[in-house]
Amino acid sequence: MARPQPNVLVNTDHGMMIVNRLDYALAPDGKSGYGVGFQLLNKGNYDPEEINLVKFLAKDMADQLDRPITMIDGGANIGVHTIEWAKYLNHRGRIVAFEAQEHIYHMLCGNAALNNCFNVKLFNAALGAEEGWLEIPKPNYNDTGSFGSMELKQHDKSEHIGQDLTKKTTVPTMAIDDFEFQHLDFLKLDVEGMEMEALAGADETIKRCKPRMLIEIIKIDRAEISGWLAERDYTAYPFAGNFIAVHKSDSMSDRITSENGVISIS
């Protein structure tokens, strides 16, 4: 019986990585594709501008603080951000990463090990408003699909990832507040429409620690999240389908601007 081999080892700009070669969906034009695996296999990297911006913001914090910084990668996928941050910061920081899809989580763990990232803590869980369990789709990883685009909570307008999602599985949900982090310096949320729920579960931590944030806004209401952030004295700066959120007490707030989605830092 044939045994498919979708996972391959790829020498990317981010280091050696386990990548699913079927991690892609075709764009509406039927010619171009998208997906984390697609970018890594066809370009050698994944969203380098976003990676470099976050690394700059992290280094800026690490330079100011007389302690290691803590960063959360919410929706880590196979770990491009996690690995880049971990290698860049080394002993100057630790990364806590969450990935809900079990098979992708296995790849995340493998990639952290391959790149000798000893300053990471990885969880196979979704981020939400509270601890619990969530039934999510279970894609076929032996077939093509943009697995990172899959919404854990499906609805009529959910993005089609390139394959039908008929099977289900159950995963734990975790709330960031339950970890009672002493410090949280940076929070990334790319959780395919569950960003507001993840923020609700991190509300007390955000109020106390005032982390810098990168929040994907493609599948959520911009006005809602802008209002939520403003109520907590954050300014949201648009950046390539995301908000960079900076608290008004942060020294970065006097240095950062955004125009037409382009971030400038003085």
Range-by-range predicted roles:
Residues 1-174, 181, ...:
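S-adenosyl-L-methionine
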Residues 35, 39-70, 135, 151-209, ...:
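Short internal loop-to-helix segment that lines adenine-nucleotide cofactor pockets
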Residues 76, 127-129, 176, 191, ...:
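Hydrophobic pocket-lining residues within nucleotide cofactor-binding pockets
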Residues 93, 120, 184:
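Short, conserved active-site loop motifs that form the nucleotide-linked donor/cofactor pocket
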Residues 117, 227-238:
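A SAM-dependent methyltransferase catalytic signature shared across enzymes that methylate proteins
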Residues 123-125, 234-242:
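Conserved S-adenosyl-L-methionine
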